[in-house]
C-alpha cells in the first residue's frame, strides 16, 4: 500500500521518510522531484514556470510508477504540486493537475494519506523555500484541497518518534 505524506515545505516529510527507512530497510521511500529539478533549473536557466511544469509532469509519472510498490512512503503527491502551482499563480498548471487528479483514478486508489502540519521552524537547506508566509499559504491551500477532494488524512504531530508511532497505529 502507498503511504503519502502531504504538507507544506519544511514540515518534516523527508526527515520522516529517512527515519522510517532506518527502522525498516524493506520500506521504499520516494522524495519529491523538486530538489533535482531546482538543481537542473540552476544549471539550465529554466524559468519558474518551466520548473513547475517539469515538477508537475514528473510527479504524475512518479505517482503512476510507484503504484505497485508495497510498503512505500512518498514525500510528495500530485495534490502538493497542484497546490504549489496555484499558490504561485500558475493557474493553467494547477488546473491541469486538478484535471489529472480527478481523471487518473488517484482519488479511488487505496492510499494512506498523512498530513503534516507546520510545527517546526524552516531550515535553509539551500533548496527549500524559506519564506514563512509562503509556507503558511501552501498549508492553508493544502487543507482546502484535502476538503475539495474529500481525502481522508491522518494528521501526524510531534517529534519524529511520535509521528512514527502514529503511523504504526494506522498500518
Residue ranges and their predicted role:
Residues 18-63:
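Conserved substrate/cofactor phosphate-moiety recognition/catalytic segment
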Residues 52-107:
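Glycine-rich phosphate-binding loop used to anchor ATP phosphates in small-molecule kinases
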Residues 13:
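Conserved lysine of the Walker
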Residues 89-162, 166:
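A glycine- and Lys/Arg-enriched "phosphate-lid" helix/loop adjacent to the NTP-binding pocket
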Amino acid at each position: 500500500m502507498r503511504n503519502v505524506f502531504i504538507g507544506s515545505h519544511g514540515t518534516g516529510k523527508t526527515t520522516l521518510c529517512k527515519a522510517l527507512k532506518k527502522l525498516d530497510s524493506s520500506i521504499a521511500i520516494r522524495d519529491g522531484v523538486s530538489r533535482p529539478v531546482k538543481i537542473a533549473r540552476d544549471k539550465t536557466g529554466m524559468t519558474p514556470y518551466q520548473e513547475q511544469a517539469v515538477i508537475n509532469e514528473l510527479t504524475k509519472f512518479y505517482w503512476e510508477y510507484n503504484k505497485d510498490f508495497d510498503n512505500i512512503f512518498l514525500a510528495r503527491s500530485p495534490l502538493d504540486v497542484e497546490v504549489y502551482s496555484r499558490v504561485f499563480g500558475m493557474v493553467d498548471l494547477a488546473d491541469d493537475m486538478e484535471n489529472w487528479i480527478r481523471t487518473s483514478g488517484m482519488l479511488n486508489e487505496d492510499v494512506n494519506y498523512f498530513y503534516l502540519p507546520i510545527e517546526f521552524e524552516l531550515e535553509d537547506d539551500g533548496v527549500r523555500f524559506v519564506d514563512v508566509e509562503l509556507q503558511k499559504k501552501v498549508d492553508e491551500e493544502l487543507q482546502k484541497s484535502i476538503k475539495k477532494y474529500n481525502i481522508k488524512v491522518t494528521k501526524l504531530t510531534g517529534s519524529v518518534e511520535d509521528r512514527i508511532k502514529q503511523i504504526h497505529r494506522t498500518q
